[in-house]
Design a protein with these regions (language model features):
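Metal-cofactor-binding active-site regions of metalloenzymes
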Residues: 17
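Structured beta-strand/loop patches that form or line metal/cofactor-binding pockets in enzymes
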Residues: 169
Length: 178
């Protein structure tokens, strides 16, 4: 296969291995790779961590302010977008609560689905490059068959122009995502 690769870290990976150590290893591997390699911060938990990733050479950053109020999520996301813009580093944001548990993230029971109108306003006010939405996916293992709110996803797609991201979709059957 000649597919591009995305190497990503979460805040718990950074805490365990250290950002500089991890990045040095990934950069060494990327230099030897015969395909493009992106280095992504997943679920960046703070402005400070996002800036550390930006300074050390990450090629894309996710700031996850979904645990904050709507206005605070907008504020932290816009701050990260503004800081990344001069370097043309794309910023993914999250709106809504993706259920389940992964690393130190606890999305609860997944009942905080993304509201389409809030998604439109959020993207307009922040300038995020992509938006992770909550439509029924969950981090970690599924207890039963995932039930995705396809209609909600369609409604969000109609009012949001940036790419939409589904976290927790690795346990979702391919046909449910198509």
């Amino acid at each position: 296969l000649q597919s591009p690769v995305i190497m990503q870290t979460t805040p718990s990976t950074v805490k365990y291995a250290g950002l500089d150590y991890y990045l040095a290893n990934v950069k060494a591997a990327a230099e030897r790779a015969k395909v493009p390699v992106a280095i992504h911060l997943d679920h960046g938990s703070s402005y400070g961590l996002a800036m550390q990733a930006l300074r050390t050479g990450y090629t894309s950053i996710m700031i996850d302010g979904s645990h904050e109020s709507f206005e605070d999520n907008i504020a932290v996301t816009k701050s990260v977008v503004d800081a990344c813009a001069p370097s043309a580093i794309p910023v993914e944001a999250e709106l809504g609560k993706v259920g389940g548990k992964e690393d130190d993230l606890d999305g609860g029971d997944g009942d905080g689905y993304t509201d389409p109108e809030q998604a439109r306003e959020f993207v307009e006010r922040t300038g995020a490059s992509s938006l992770a939405v909550a439509i029924g996916t969950a981090h970690g293992l599924y207890k039963g068959e995932p039930k995705l709110d396809q209609e909600r996803l369609w409604e969000i797609r109609q009012v949001v122009s940036v790419p939409l991201v589904l976290h927790g979709a690795s346990g979702v059957p391919d046909e449910a995502v198509r």
